[in-house]
Amino acid sequence: MNLLTKILRMGEGRKLKALQRTVEEVSAREPEVRGLSDAALRARTDEFKERLQGGETLDDLLPEAFAVVREVARRTLGLRPFDVQVMGGVVLHQGKIAEMKTGEGKTLVATMPVYLNALAGRGVHVVTVNDYLARRDAEWMGPIYEFLGLEVGVIQESMGFEERKKAYAADITYGTNAQFGFDYLRDNIATSPDQLVQRELHYAIVDEVDSILIDEARTPLIISGLPESAADLYYRFAAIVPRLREGEDYEVDEKKRQVAPTEQGVAKVEKALGIPNLYDGVNTNLVNHLIQALRAHTLFRRDREYIVRDGQVFIVDEFTGRVLEGRRYSEGLHQAIEAKEGVEIKEENQTVATITIQNYFRQYEKLAGMTGTAATEADEFMHTYKMEVVSIPTHRPMIRVDRDDLVYRTKKAKYAAVIDDIVERHRKGQPVLVGTVSVEVSEHLSALLKRRGIKHNVLNAKHHEREAEIIAEAGKKGAVTIATNMAGRGTDIKLGGSDESGGGEEWTEEHERLASEIMEKYPTITRDMLEGRSLESLEVVNLGGLYVLGTERHEARRIDNQLRGRSGRQGDPGESRFYLSFEDDLLRLFGGQRMQSLMERIGLEEDEAIEAGMVSNSVRRAQEQVESRNFQMRKRILEYDDVLNKQREVIYAIRREILMGEKVDTMSYVEDVLTDVISRYASEDVYPEEWDLEGLATELNRFYPCQVDFSSLDIESATADQVREMVLEDARERLEERRAEWEERTAELERRGLARADGLDSFEEAERRTLLSVVDSRWREHLYEMEYLREGIGWRGLGQRDPLVEYKREGYDLFVEMERGIREDYVTYIYRIENLKLSETDVERLSYSGGGEEPNQRPKSPRRRSERKIGPNEPCPCGSGKKFKKCHGRVGAPPLPTSQSQ
């Protein structure tokens, strides 16, 4: 053991001693609390709340509050949290991660910090990996909270708005990370305060924290809007790409998950499409179509990265084997896969709101988590979330036996050995859990077992409906269960099946005989651990418990540990082993030459296995290499998203102010916009004789109905300030006229007993709604531009420039441009408010198309669309040399000439 490890372990020991002292304080209050009546126990909640208001802290209340929850759990559920569970609860209250092994009762652990933090009255969120677990945990632990006078809500995907609002208003809310995240995004595209559901992000406990905060960190949550149509192109490229040859027409880098066409490949594609140059400016969208079609063809495999069900493509979570409902690959990849599989293409959507899991959860005032496997990712938790990992001791000693890996030359030989092992274990009655890395492998093994006549269950993304039922029965005698990765995580596998206790089964001589054999075989197992168990449960324990068989090492050691952790719960016996082959992706891609030379030196027969420390070390090194790479990828994603996150915070804060009734200072927007216009046409740095007052009048009319008579100016003595004062005074008068007209018309409608069609009660409300629509529209366009910038920024590295620095700089410029666009759009709108419907569609139409001086003076003939929409940052087709958004794509700009129109 090196010095650093010793120091770290000493630190761990000190932490556990401090936690133990807190546990002793909780236990010291137990006799007093146990003597209270139900009513007196319930009354402690109000007492705690009063003490908080009186200046005491949650830390002051912790020993008493935890003792109260411990007693209520005993009375309502018949479960008394062990000392190690109380210890885990303290860690969660401290905003840290409690690493607790499978079967240690994490669900019960959470009740103590949840209750304590709910006393503050600001809401507590308990985050789970799926809807089933959210509902199960809320119902299971609900009696504790309800006994203590707290309300419990649960969020489910199928819930409507009113149900969600009620669930969030409760003291404690259970739900999935996706539901909490999407509700946050929906709140930030709401158009009235009545549409908000969430309260402040106060305190959250994340169950299976490694799965949610690390494994899903690379997948952003996205709410999308209406699409652009390009289905035919996806099908065309799906037909072209299979005709290309790897190595000649394109190169694939499986490690980096990248693909690149060669010059020869590009020439073939150009010929197939009948175009002279794929990289010509008007064909830039075709390059992305080619890249995504190549990725879909080479890197994404059916029944591994995705499945096809009911004519739709569903992403499969590589870590859990579950279908990621509602998630789609971005940048056209999902559509490329749909075209490859020949199913209907669902059009690309425009991003309306997006946030990464990382940045959503970093917003909580206090964040805690629990899992069975976090130690290997401790650095990442600290770096990204500032969360410390604390390993909690098990209640009973762990006696599972983890066997060395067996490595075969080929997958075929490996699977044959796996099936033989399963058959042998099944015949003696030992339950077997087989872990696979993909749906494809699980179904292949299932077919092999069927040939051998072995009854079994398959748990993968295709059979997720029966997940809890299948996993709960995986510990029955003779059961064989094949599961993709950690499908079924969160559900305990009890030896003998879900009814481990046998429903109060009376013990016989056979029970006694088995109990004696077990205690003789396993000295750490005591009689009280066996009492009350069913005969089947005792038989399974005597057979060695659950046997976990991994068919491939995962990229992350943590996922392997999770699989192993399904066995040996609460001091039960268990066994685990991984079967590998040199053809496995991990060994093939990351094992390097060492593995190849080892294989050649040993000269293995196909059906022979090696079981050597050298192989295990090579596997560990390969896993560490991948873990490091994945951490760097997540870290880089976060660095880029942090740029957008700061901008998001600004925009969402503005929206929230508008939404909550903050009065809009319209005149300040008018002053900013018109001052900018005046500085371009009548600058104080230019002689008045050189001012373009005619051009100024025309430009001002694009923003408001200008009535300034510039001919009255004495041009020789005029100043820029004088011009500014004239314009702003006129603009102020026109705004007041608009306001007066509005109020007059509204009053007239009221006199007639009518209501406004747009539902706006006052000009103030109209100002708020208009600004909100403009902010949303411009933010959507900005998200598109930032995504466009992000996709191409990597090439800056070739010019010896740091892509991240460039992204920050250009992202800031785009944000400043967006802010100016918001001001200009708002001013244009507010002066014409009586003539326009206040909808986001109209705001977008104004932003992207243009028109005359008045929005209702549009050309009567419809504008033609070419196949491709002109991007805001592309050169304007009119030939001016300016970006499109600065020229004919600008608010109020005249339409392009017919031959060039969009």
Curated annotation (Swiss-Prot):
The keyword Transcription does not apply. SUPFAM superfamilies: Helical scaffold and wing domains of SecA, P-loop containing nucleoside triphosphate hydrolases, Pre-protein crosslinking domain of SecA. The keyword GTP-binding does not apply. One of its GO terms (biological process) is protein transport by the Sec complex. GO terms for cellular component: cell envelope Sec protein transport complex; cytosol; plasma membrane. It is a peripheral membrane protein. May bind 1 zinc ion per subunit. Pfam families: P-loop_SecA, SEC-C, SecA_DEAD, SecA_PP_bind, SecA_SW. GO terms for molecular function: ATP binding; metal ion binding; protein-exporting ATPase activity. Its main location: membrane. PROSITE patterns: SECA, SECA_MOTOR_DEAD. It catalyses: ATP + H2O + cellular proteinSide 1 = ADP + phosphate + cellular proteinSide 2. Residues 846-902 are annotated as: Disordered. Zn(2+) binds at residues 876, 878, 887-888. It is an enzyme of class 7 (translocase). Keywords: ATP-binding, Cell membrane, Cytoplasm, Membrane, Metal-binding, Nucleotide-binding, Protein transport, Translocase, Translocation, Transport, Zinc. SMART domains: SecA_DEAD, SecA_PP_bind. Its EC number is 7.4.2.8. ATP binds at residues 85, 103-107, 492. It is found in: Cell membrane; Cytoplasm. Belongs to the SecA family. Monomer and homodimer. Part of the essential Sec protein translocation apparatus which comprises SecA, SecYEG and auxiliary proteins SecDF. Other proteins may also be involved. HAMAP family: SecA. Part of the Sec protein translocase complex. Interacts with the SecYEG preprotein conducting channel. Has a central role in coupling the hydrolysis of ATP to the transfer of proteins into and across the cell membrane, serving as an ATP-driven molecular motor driving the stepwise translocation of polypeptide chains across the membrane. This is Protein translocase subunit SecA. It comes from Rubrobacter xylanophilus (strain DSM 9941 / JCM 11954 / NBRC 16129 / PRD-1). The lineage of its organism: Bacteria, Bacillati, Actinomycetota, Rubrobacteria, Rubrobacterales.
